From Swiss-Prot:
Organism: Talaromyces stipitatus (strain ATCC 10500 / CBS 375.48 / QM 6759 / NRRL 1006) (Penicillium stipitatum)
A GO cellular component annotation in the UniProt record: mitochondrial inner membrane
Subcellular location: Mitochondrion inner membrane
Name of this chain's protein: ATPase synthesis protein 25, mitochondrial
Biased composition (Basic and acidic residues): 286-296
Biased composition (Polar residues): 311-322
GO biological process, one term: mitochondrial gene expression
Keywords: Membrane, Mitochondrion, Mitochondrion inner membrane, Transit peptide
Membrane recorded as keyword: yes
Record's keyword annotation contains Mitochondrion: yes
InterPro entries named in the record: Atp25 (IPR040152), NT_sf (IPR043519)
Chain segment of the transit peptide: 1-60
Length: 680
């Protein structure tokens, strides 16, 4: 029965297939499914000629599959060998990955030529130790006009990561400069280590109190979080120069003035983008493309040729053809904007016409050059006159133009030139104020100065010096204009002189480095001692000394000792000894005249404390000078007067730690001291 059932099952195609699969599973073989007759024919394509397929119904056996794998391995090796056979100049170079943005932020800028040796060390410290990013170095040396920080400045700009990092960076940088290079940097905008924390805590407390009471706290800028700190490193000197100065073998204190000034600008990221100092101090060639297109339309018109025009004025017919001179399209600018040119143009004596506006343009530079010879002669004549002659020749006042022959010659020489008349009136006004002419006042001179500068005319340095000196001349005793006090008059005079110096310094003049102008300011303050408190006068003297220190004046001129004397008379002891130490530092040794001035000025100042300190320190130093300062009649008299002001008497005063030469003349000092006691 089983055999009959088996035979019947083989008649069915499906049953027969199932029966065969049951046997093959037991043996461990895998049955191959036959392709259905309705399946479309497929042809397999290969890239190698080693495999040939005759029919789509033919299947690869195990031996054929192994042969195909061997052929594929052979093809792979052949392609590798073919790539190695390619010459080096035909091989494709591997793609180099771009630098990480963090690496670009920490790049150190290149040091310019002839920079101080400390510049590279400062950049290394700011980048590696401080951690400033996106550092930029701007070489402002030789900039015309020079920046307000000075004419020899190297500026470094960097970005701090946060407000806290900004304050910590500036504080650590200043401490590093003081400890490593013994410099005295000044950080503008830097708060102390705990001061910032305290102020921020107080600000947060006020905000909480305001929110609890239902009011809105003041969110205006309180100066705490400015996001900008300017570290003025100061004048950086060449170490070789300092070493050569130290090898001189002198005694004293001070430092070498001059050199390159380094300024480090530290910003937060937002503040740096807002201020944009790089664009402000960038050279003219590196301006932005947008600004260049707006302000210089002709520079963006493509390549064009320029013909040299004849210097004479000629009228050309516009119908004449001009070849090979392509010109850009003319752009009409309707915005009200004034353009200033810094280039040197071709100046002529004629009056040109502006092609854009149609107005006549007067060449003020040529006009001033034509009027320079008569004005120079008038200026020389005024300087040679005495005050009495000046008052007589200037007539009754500013409105007088023909009462004297001198005035008629002056106004006829300048003609109708506006610049010449303005400069002449300014020159006569300065001479009249200096001679204390009753018709010329300092207020009138100040008005003339404002008119001259507002018109755009430059003032020469000699004339500017005369104007500043005229403002500092003592006023007449009967001057009671507008009911102001003597202190207010002195403040007006000094402020006016400083404004004149500031205007000239912006034009590149060197009047701001003249000691004589500052000495006249000190003399004006001394005249105000009778009507003003001593503390107020000292504060004004300190302001003048700070200005002189920031400018970096050298103490080698003839007016240096006069400046030193005036400072002590005004109570500025620190300013006095600043110059006193600089004399030894610059000249190598002090002379007998210097010590005579030292003791005499302390006696004239009349301060017992300063006089006692001077006697206790500098009498013993005279024997240590090279060459030693020997006794003389003038120094003996000055020491006696200084001892009298200090409160010493002839019975108790002795020369302590003095040299043998000075011990021998001690009796002469005591004799002069007894004479002074008898006179008082």
């Amino acid at each position: 029965m089983a055999a009959a059932a088996l035979i019947r099952s083989t008649r069915c195609n499906t049953c027969r297939r199932y029966l065969l699969q049951s046997f093959t599973r037991v043996v461990g073989l895998t049955a191959q499914n036959s392709r259905l007759p309705n399946e479309p024919q497929r042809r397999q394509f290969f890239t190698t000629p080693y495999l040939n397929i005759k029919s789509s119904h033919r299947h690869l056996s195990d031996r054929d599959a192994s042969a195909a794998s061997n052929n594929e391995y052979f093809i792979t090796n052949e392609s590798a060998n073919s790539s190695q056979a390619v010459p080096w100049y035909l091989q494709v170079e591997p793609v180099i990955e771009p630098t990480h943005p963090a690496v670009r932020q920490q790049e150190i800028p290149a040091v310019p030529a002839n920079a101080p040796p400390i510049t590279q060390e400062i950049l290394q410290h700011l980048s590696l130790e401080i951690g400033l990013d996106d550092m930029v170095l701007l070489d402002l040396r030789g900039r015309d006009p020079p920046p307000a920080l000075g004419g020899n400045v190297i500026m470094v700009i960097g970005t701090a990561r946060s407000l806290k990092h900004l304050n910590v960076s500036a504080d650590r940088f200043c401490r590093w400069l003081r400890s490593t290079y013994k410099l005295r940097p000044y950080a503008d905008g830097l708060l102390g280590r705990n001061e910032l924390k305290i102020k921020l805590r107080r600000k947060a407390r006020r905000a909480r109190l305001a929110s609890s009471s239902g009011t809105i706290s003041d969110t205006s800028d309180d100066g705490i979080t400015t996001g900008w700190i300017c570290v003025n490193v100061g004048s950086v000197d060449d170490p070789s120069v300092v070493q050569n100065m130290r090898e001189g073998g002198f005694e004293g204190f001070g430092k070498v003035q001059g050199g390159t000034r380094i300024v480090v600008q530290m910003f937060t990221e937002d503040k740096r983008a807002d201020v944009d100092l790089e664009q402000l101090w960038a050279p003219k060639d590196n301006v932005k493309a947008g600004d260049s297109e707006e302000n210089h339309s002709y520079s963006t018109g493509g390549d064009y040729q320029v013909r040299s025009m004849p210097p004479i004025t000629s009228e050309n017919n516009s119908n004449h053809p001009i070849s090979n001179v392509p010109r850009p399209l003319r752009r009409v600018d309707l915005s009200q904007r004034r353009s200033f040119s810094t280039g040197a143009g071709q100046h002529s004596a004629r009056t040109d016409v502006d092609p854009e506006s149609g107005y006549e343009v007067v060449d003020a530079k040529n006009e001033s050059s034509r009027q320079e010879p008569p004005l120079s002669a008038i200026f020389s004549t005024l300087k040679e006159m005495s005050p009495e002659e000046t008052i007589e020749q200037l007539g009754s006042g500013p409105e007088d133009k023909n009462s004297t022959e001198f005035l008629r010659d002056c106004y006829s020489s300048v003609g109708t030139s506006h610049n010449g008349n303005s400069a002449l009136r300014l020159m006569l006004g300065a001479a009249g104020v200096s001679a204390q002419h009753p018709g010329y006042t300092k207020e009138y001179l100040w008005t003339l100065f404002l008119e001259q500068t507002a018109s755009g005319y430059r003032i020469s340095e000699p004339l500017g010096f005369e104007i500043a000196s005229a403002f500092l001349v003592p006023r007449r005793l009967d001057a009671k204009e507008q009911g102001r006090t003597a202190s207010e008059f002195v403040d007006f005079d000094i402020e006016s002189a400083m404004r004149v110096m500031d205007n000239l310094s912006l034009n590149g003049e060197t009047i701001i480095r003249k000691h004589r102008v500052y000495n006249m300011m000190y003399e004006a303050l001394i005249l105000g001692l009778r009507n003003e408190r001593l503390d107020d006068v000292r504060l004004k003297a300190l302001r003048i000394r700070t200005l002189m220190t920031e400018i970096g004046l050298d103490w080698q001129s003839e007016d240096t000792r006069e400046t030193m004397q005036l400072r002590l008379l005004l109570g500025d002891v620190d300013g006095f000894y600043e110059i006193w130490h600089a004399i030894a530092f610059n000249e190598g040794s002090r002379t007998a005249d210097d010590y005579e001035l030292l003791f005499r000025v302390h006696a004239e100042a009349g301060n017992p404390v300063y006089a006692r300190e001077c006697l206790g320190v500098w009498i013993s130093m005279m024997g240590r000078e090279d060459p030693p300062v020997l006794p003389s009649a003038s120094i003996i008299s000055a020491i006696a007067r200084c001892a009298h002001v200090a409160g010493h008497d002839a019975d108790t005063f002795r020369l302590l730690s003095a040299s043998d030469e000075w011990r021998e003349v001690e009796r002469l000092i005591l004799s002069d001291l007894r004479t002074l006691e008898q006179l008082t």
